[in-house]
From Swiss-Prot:
Transmembrane segments: none
Example GO BP: translation
Highest taxon listed in the record's lineage: Bacteria
UniProt protein name: Large ribosomal subunit protein bL33
SUPFAM superfamilies in the cross-refs: Zn-binding ribosomal proteins
Alphabetized PANTHER family for the sequence: 50S RIBOSOMAL PROTEIN L33, CHLOROPLASTIC (PTHR43168), LARGE RIBOSOMAL SUBUNIT PROTEIN BL33C (PTHR43168:SF2)
NCBIfam families (alphabetical): PRK00504.1, PRK00595.1, rpmG_bact
HAMAP family noted in UniProt: Ribosomal_bL33
Family: Belongs to the bacterial ribosomal protein bL33 family.
Lineage, highest ranks first: Bacteria, Bacillati, Cyanobacteriota, Cyanophyceae, Synechococcales
GO cellular component: cytoplasm; ribonucleoprotein complex; ribosome
Pfam families with a match to the protein in the record: Ribosomal_L33
Leader sequence segment: none
């Protein structure tokens, strides 16, 4: 029998202000990778993390 998929998946968090902010330290978009339990957290994650491109703490949203 085949083994079932685990509940944990790898997701990518992207800075929401890097796309719109023109006055930032360096060009580009900051991304973090992390894992989440798809059974406990079905909605998309939103975490406040440090963005080195914007040089401050910003909201990072889960992307596909």
């Amino acid at each position: 029998m085949a083994k079932a998929k685990g509940a944990r998946i790898i997701i990518t968090l992207e800075c929401t202000e890097c796309r719109t902010n023109v006055n930032k330290r360096s060009p580009g978009v900051n991304r973090y990778t992390t894992t989440k339990n798809r059974r406990n957290t079905t909605a998309r994650l939103e975490l406040k993390k440090f963005c080195p491109k914007c040089n401050r703490h910003t909201v990072h949203k889960e992307i596909k």
